[in-house]
Amino acid sequence: MVLRVLSRSCKLTTALAFGTVGATLYAAEAAPTHPAHSVKHAAPLGSAPVRHRNAGHATSRTATDAETIKVTTRKLPTRFNTEQHVGSSTTMISAETLQQRAVITTTDIQKLAPNLQIETQYGSSALNFHLRGVGFNDLTMNNTPSVMPYIDGVAYPISSMTSGPLFDIDSIGVDPGPSGFTHGQTTTGGEVRITTKAPEKQFHAGIAEDFASYNRSKTDAFVTGSITHNLQYRLAAELLEGGGYYTNRDTGQSLGDQHTGAIRGKLAWQPDEQTDVNLTGYWSLNRSEAPGFRINNNLSAFAGHYGRDLGYYQTGWDIKPAFAKLIGYHDTKPQFNDLNWGFHLAMAHRFRFGQLDISSAYDAVQLHEYQDQDGMPYATADDYRTQVANSFTQEVSFHNLKDSTSRFSWDAGLYYNRIMQKQNNYYDFSDYALRGYMSETRFSSPQETFNQYVTLGYKVLKNLRFVGSISHESDSRQLVDLTTIHFGHNDLNFGTHGALANQFTGKVGIEYQATPTSLFYADIRKGMKPGGFTANNTVVAQQAQPIKPETILAYEIGTKNDFFAHRLRLNAAAFYYDYRDQQVLGNIVVPSYGSVGSYVSVPRSTIWGVEGSMEAHPTRDLTLTQVVGYQRGVYDQFHSINAAQVNAYYAKTGIWQAFYSNYHGVDSGIPKISMNGSAVYTIHVLPHYHVLFDVDYSYRGAEGLIPGNPPYRTVPAYFLLNSFLTFEPNSRKWSATVYATNLADRKYDLTRSQATNVQTAISGPPRFIGGRLNYNF
């Protein structure tokens, strides 16, 4: 550190230098790559700290306007150092890691965090998030998730709204456990927070092109800069094409090509030094081919023609002219036609005693998806779904301006969300003997959620802090005019149903900063998720009844540590969940019809586990990471359909009959082990150029998807190995990369399901070998 102070007192100089560095340590760690700079005319000592848009720059306060202090920050090996002083088990993922680990879609995030699963809903574009065994398989896309996805601070409570491309990302935070105490909506499972890149004052642009196996191409571009001295912009776009690896077993046609495009625009305005206004608009279109369903076991009358698929990427499809006419479908392959768009407005004003944040968001989705769920050219389970939905969110929050010396902290806010949606779900059962018709289930579903929250923190000692939170959420939703039409047979009208939830949740916690780089914490949290409805192929009144809200009482202890000047990071956590009225996807057996999906509540269950992460920099050129998660879940009180026994009886007799089992003490099917790790080595080949070489892996344990964990609905464990080699200048202005994902070409499944009496799976991607060029200017 170099100090040049126009002061007569050397003692004052020393005090200023060390006092400033100590006060700004967290900020300097948060963005270690910022260059040294000088600050003149600093605020007087004792003035309120101000949160600036570029809050990672080291700043200094001086005694007189004549003084100048020059501060040089040291680049630390680790990232996200500020988060190391927060009592939570959040996993932070940087933009660089996302690119290096070839994260193409949102589902790829699960390869980087412990005890996290992100899966498509039986091959649709809608996503289901599970964290520490808590999650919800939203078969009907009309219920609130247990794990809430956020993009730039805006909650997405409809699963189909998270289907857009993942591009121009700044960071991702995976935060397990009940949430909703400082922002947003109450959850039982946690949050996945995606933050996109913000506008910059200096002009900056870039383009990246990625080519890979199966004719997959991915193009990303952005441009950012200033319009005026206090108005900045950023425009980013992505185009993803190809990559289909499924093959029609009869015709040899390929299936699964991606055809997606998206654009996002941002404006950042600072009308004065204490106010920030940010406007975001986005648009994305998905006209991709649907994934293929591989037959695992065929109990239908066509088993002689289409038995178990031996080729791992085999599938089949067809669409009958009558069904195509009914739904107005003109393509020959199963395909999506989804449109997502929205606007977000966020305003922040800093007072001397606190910051006021106001945000408004409007998001909309128009979804049209056709899938051949039986994987055959016969019409036993051909599905076409349409959804038109919009979400309006308004949030007002107020918090004090905290810094490392603050003894008291507080956050308070109000959150409101209103959703309107309409759905039509068509099925073609023409070739299924027990039905032999086409059907449509339609409904509309308005819902409102209102959450109020307060969080208080107090340092009883310099290094000991207590935290307390309370929130109250009310939720009202309806299922309006639920109707199922069996064309040529009958109409079933189930009327209108409602569900209410009105509960308090909260948190108490303690944080102990044992050393400047070692934190210990413990907390108890209660979370709540509203109830909801089954609204997919509804044939009996029981399906239309609402499920109860679920609650969790969560206990967690953890520690965060940096050793050897931040060259070794070790974080660990242990948790225990007391789960009440857990919402799971079960079955109802309807005689002379078959087994149909329906949400059921598990009165009592428990989940417990441990997590650990390591980041090591043994040398300047070597980085090692390792993440491990272990979890167990059991049903303590649960009596439900035994799906395996139902199917076995049908296979033997051709009759659908309900059989029930007591699942007390039975494993709930969550993946017990999840791991990922990487080794990245930098080779300095020339004075101004280097090569990055990486080997990384991910492992996920077996996952049972329905109670009892029958094999046909259990996704086996899998291990994936990846690698990349990047050549770039030290300035990182451009880079050239070759990479491989699933290097060992492992055969694995993304999900397993059953459509009428055909048990199917969706195969995971095979080995992809690709190259990526990136240029910034």
Regions of interest found by a model, annotated:
Residues 200-202, 210, 221-319, 324, ...:
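Periplasmic-side early beta-strands and strand-to-turn transitions of outer-membrane beta-barrels
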Residues 144-146, 158, 167-176, 181-263, ...:
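Outer-membrane beta-barrel translocator/receptor signature
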Residues 268-272, 398-401, 407-417, 443-578, ...:
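Structural signature of Gram-negative outer-membrane beta-barrels, strongest in the C-terminal barrel
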Residues 56, 61-202, 557:
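Acidic, small-polar-rich N-terminal luminal/periplasmic segments of exported/outer-membrane proteins
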Residues 224, 391-403, 408-413, 459, ...:
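Conserved C-terminal beta-signal and adjacent last beta-strands/turns
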